[in-house]
């Protein structure tokens, strides 16, 4: 991920803070996606949630976690995974409905793009900037 010349350069405090914060929020959001998947009734929505979990947020989590590990930094805590439940087992008054889930996902995707743009703007290391550029797309 980091090339040899940039790997020798230390991270500045903003890069460390934002890498660590991004990893923490991604770990928390992965658990949120598990909960929302339990609440979703529409199969297309469940498939979409599975896709962004497996192909969107999980690879981002792994890449940022590897950067922090390789830098010798302590990783943020991860909340425990949630068990799979059937949507019918969730009381109607406690259940998110499908339009609410879709709106929550839309909001998170937009916020993620803004955060990635901000991190790209403050990064000194080109490889980190490029990584968040990939996350942005």
Where are these regions (language model features)?
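Preference for long, well-ordered alpha-helical segments
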Residues: 108-137
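Alpha-helical scaffold segments that form or flank carboxylate-/histidine-based iron centers
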Residues: 11-19, 43-58, 100-101, 126-136
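Hydrophobic alpha-helical segments
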Residues: 4-8, 66-79, 85, 137
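Generic structural signal for well-ordered, non-transmembrane alpha-helical segments
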Residues: 27, 50-58, 62, 106-113, ...
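The feature marks the first
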Residues: 1-43
